[in-house]
């Protein structure tokens, strides 16, 4: 079932996601379409406070996933990329890196802030505040564990 992102994702006058609106609309669409097992929507796009088509800032598609996952209080948000999670070093420059299996939200945000390109620091904030874990997974190796980001230490 295709759910229209432009009817679910909205930003306020400060270009910040309107989480109350997003939660209300996501739950509305899920309740109106209960017979589907798979829901698809667009990432990165939204409407602004004036109803104009706009976009979320950097990390927009991952941000969309985290906003919707947090709004719906899902078990886990999955972000699929070309590497199996956060690594102990930057695999573009260091050979033989290994994925870190678990990180606290604060650790992941700090790594992202200081250059880990796999994740934008702001995109996991909705999941953090809602207590929904985020798992980073590899599209080229779907069986890999990846990295789980949560509030556990």
Tell where the protein language model's regions lie, with residue ranges:
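A conserved active-site cap/scaffold subdomain adjacent to cofactor or substrate pockets
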Residues: 109-153
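Nucleotide/pyrophosphate-binding catalytic subdomain
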Residues: 1-124
